[in-house]
Amino acid sequence: MEMRDVYLRDGTFTGLSIPKHTPMKPGQYLLHSIIIMKTADGQYIMQQRSLKAKYSPGEWDVTGGGVLSGETSAEAAVREAKEELGVEVNPDSLVHMLREITMWGEEYGMICDTYAARVELPETGFRISEYEVNDVKCVPFEEFLETVTYNKTEGFKDMLIRADKLI
């Protein structure tokens, strides 16, 4: 059973860990991690969510997921890239770009850390997790920006523009 650590809104660990999908209580936040991956030739990797996904099935988006109990958001970013796409990310190449809070109810939500990194495409091609990913492609920055910001904040869009110049 996957466990998640519970945090306060300011990112302080409460000492509590709960099973994935446990209903949240007021003042509780889970940690989530996103990784923006730019290839050596300047393309961006984006994935199409599984058609069976609970949230946003079939939509093209960035790679990411929940941070497991005892894991940092940076470790989760590296793990998610490997699990979902088979992409190896050097942890030393990660650049922390943004921390945002998303409310799921009036008094609880998610703390989301976004990282950016240059990556090498897998020599044997992407190995997608069919449970989470339907398809994957590499696209120019403009297409990536337009596609993945449909449900994101202006701060996220601004961060992507900064990341493009940084990585």
Region annotations inferred by a language model:
Residues 21, 57-58, 98-100, 106-167:
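Nudix hydrolase/Nudix homology domain
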Residues 1-34, 40:
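Acidic, metal-coordinating catalytic segment for phosphate/diphosphate chemistry
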Residues 27, 53-54, 104-107:
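Short glycine/serine/proline-enriched coil/turn segments at secondary-structure junctions
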Residues 32-64:
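A glycine-rich, hydrophobic loop/mini-helix early in the fold
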Residues 13, 96-97:
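Residue-level detector of beta-propeller blades
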Residues 10, 39-42, 50, 118-123, ...:
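Short loop segments at secondary-structure junctions
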Residues 45-46, 62-96:
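The catalytic Nudix box helix
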